[in-house]
Regions:
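Bacterial N-terminal signal peptides that target proteins for export
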Residues: 1-9
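Bacterial N-terminal signal peptides
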Residues: 8-18
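C-terminal and inter-domain tail/linker signature
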Residues: 22-297
Length: 297
């Protein structure tokens, strides 16, 4: 009898082991970090078989529905840098990914949405060679030198404060009301990698080159107060001639004591279609280049 009971316990443990591994995914910080870790492992291998994907999982690239079996997530790559936001209020994560491979470099942002113990949505905005302001090596250099440390609980900004800071910055592109933006000093902005503000001085500012007349629309936020970070998935303009191209875009912010400290952008717009005479006027009336990753075309 004891032998039978022991055998049943062992069998039960074996059968439940995989489920227990996937069950670590949840809306807690630990569960969301587990989802990110599994995603990074899958992205590195270009193999989603190890991901606990929900039935009918949603997959998008550059704000358009895409086939997960043909997407960037299926492209193996050596990842040089990641930075993640964990949003326990909405069960979402955002991960900034930099790949400096000479043949197939990338900078992209990935959003995951977790539903209980499954990944229900995967969304990627990617850029690579030939896209607006792209420079993976420079992006890695700037991003890896920045400090996005965990902020002490008694010094953290609220979720509302972080979203308000992001909105104020993005709103300034439309009406030039820059005095409403909580500028911090120093503040450094990295756009695509090729463009960067800041020289390591105490008065470095992100208050440069902000255009007017660009309606940054379709905003969706992922917020992580623990590291003072918020990212806006958006379109750079409303998709008309006077209001910007409508190119898929991710704006990532680090906020310290209510003030902007770092700004990162990833914009999915072919450089050849860039028509702006100044920073911010990205593209013409349409947002081009929303197809498969270049090395899969």
């Amino acid at each position: 009898m004891k032998r039978i009971t022991l055998w049943c316990m062992v069998l039960t443990g074996v059968l439940l082991a995989p489920a227990a591994g996937f069950a670590q995914i949840s809306c807690s910080r630990e569960g969301l970090q587990r989802a990110v870790d599994l995603y990074i492992a899958a992205q590195t291998k270009g193999d989603t078989s190890g991901l606990p994907l929900a039935m009918g999982v949603g997959y998008m690239e550059n704000v358009a529905p895409a086939d997960i079996n043909k997407g960037l997530i299926k492209t193996p790559m050596k990842i040089d840098h990641v930075r993640s936001l964990l949003d326990t209020a909405t069960c979402q994560t955002y991960t900034e990914v930099i790949v400096t491979d000479k043949e197939h470099p990338y900078v992209f942002g990935t959003r995951l949405r977790v539903n209980h113990d499954k990944i229900a949505e995967v969304e990627i905005i990617w850029t690579t060679t030939g896209y607006w302001g792209f420079g993976a090596d420079a992006y890695l250099n700037y991003s890896s030198e920045e400090k996005w440390d965990t902020i002490a609980a008694n010094k953290r900004d609220t979720r509302d404060t972080l979203v308000a800071a992001a909105n104020a910055y993005l709103d300034a592109f439309l009406e030039q009301k820059k005095d409403l933006v909580p500028w911090g000093y120093p503040c450094n902005r990295t756009e695509g990698g090729a463009m960067h503000t800041g020289r390591g001085n105490a008065d470095d500012s992100c208050d440069v080159g902000v255009p007017s007349g660009v309606n940054i629309s379709n905003r969706r936020f992922i917020v992580d107060p623990a590291i003072g970070a918020v990212v806006a998935f958006c379109t750079f303009g409303a998709g008309n001639v006077n209001g910007g191209s409508g190119a898929p875009d991710a704006h990532l912010f680090r906020v310290e004591s209510g003030k902007l400290r770092f700004v990162h952008t990833v914009t999915h717009l072919l450089q050849a279609n860039f028509q702006g005479g100044q920073r911010g006027q990205r593209g013409g009336p349409a947002a081009p280049g929303r197809g498969a990753p270049p090395n899969q075309q």
